[in-house]
Amino acid sequence: CYHQSDLDVLQDFIDNSSATIPMIWDSDTSDSIEPLELQIQKWDENGRLTKLWFYDYTLSDDYTMSGEIPENIGNLTQLDTLNLAFNQLSGEIPESIGSLINLNYLYLYKNKLGGTIPDSICNIFPNYINFQIYENYFCPPYPTCVPIGKIGAQDISNCP
């Protein structure tokens, strides 16, 4: 049994990316991607999502996750690992990211994310073992809790 709010976040990722999701992920060959078919997932004994990977650098840019990170990402409160690298995600990091207090690994590099990094990330930053957001479009100023070396290379040509 899976926690419904966790499944809802996965469904929102699907809804945001419907045009670009690789159909090779359709393991039950139903011609539609369902939440439990999204790449690599690990669930705990209470039905909570603890690891989520939407990462396949071998796929073409035409077949990756796209759209925005759902605002309800903060509902994944048991998440330890979030790997969204090598996708076409756009928009800003949702403020609710600060609710992921169990997060130890956050990989958002090589996307099209931009805007400002929310200060709420400071709620979880001390937990990070690994934090990689390079090759996006994040604009300064960056939250003071994030060492500048962790920001990496950003395209700031469209920043105000």
Residue ranges and their predicted role:
Residues L52-F54, D80-L84, N104-L108, I129-I133:
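Conserved hydrophobic beta-strand positions in leucine-rich repeat
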Residues K110-L113, S120-C159:
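Leucine-rich repeat domain C-terminal region
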Residues Y57, Y63, N87, L108-N111, ...:
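Consensus "Asn ladder" position of solenoid repeat domains
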Residues S66-G74, S90-E95, G114-C122, P141-T144:
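The feature encodes a structural signal of leucine-rich repeats
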Residues N46-R48, G74-L79, G98-L103, N123-Y128, ...:
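Leucine-rich repeat
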Residues L103-Y105, K112-I117:
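Acidic, glycine-rich calcium-binding repeat modules characteristic of RTX/beta-roll
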Residues Y2-G74:
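LRR flanking "cap" motifs
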